[in-house]
Amino acid sequence: MSIAFNHTIVAARDKRESAEFLTELFDLPAPTSFGPFMVVTLDHGASLDYADVAESDEIRPQHYAFLVSEDEFDAIYGKISARGLPHWADPGASRPGQINTRDGGRGVYFRDPAGHAMEILTRPYGSGS
């Protein structure tokens, strides 16, 4: 049996702003409109489908982790730094401005415009030394 992740819905105050934030930061194709969503397509066909949430509704921050190459990490982290985006080496945000080196890779956490915890990492946790 072959099971693959296809899509998830990501709550946002401004779906276009949040989707474009990610595509610009990750150098992905521009988001596309599909029904009420702004769709960010990732490799292997998976997508993040951004949906607007009313101001009166709470957005519960979620965590989204993206496995990237070393070169992609350098490019994305360069944009994070150039934009002055707050970032951390850990999910608890206790190591601001730092990168983690877990399992022989690199990882960093930052927030998107809707407040979701985004993470880029070069090696899956538990995969190395």
Model feature map: region roles:
Residues 1-3, 59, 113:
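Structured loop/turn residues at beta-strand edges in well-structured enzyme cores
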Residues 35-36, 93, 128:
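Residue-level "edge-of-site" marker
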Residues 7, 37, 107:
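Conserved beta-strand and immediately adjacent loop positions that scaffold enzyme active sites
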Residues 28-62, 66-70, 103, 111, ...:
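Conserved short beta-strand elements that form part of the metal-binding/catalytic scaffold
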Residues 16, 65-113, 117, 125:
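Vicinal oxygen chelate
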Residues 14-29:
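Amphipathic alpha-helical segments
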Residues 1-16, 63-64, 68, 123-129:
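N-terminal beta-strand motif that seeds the catalytic metal site of vicinal oxygen chelate
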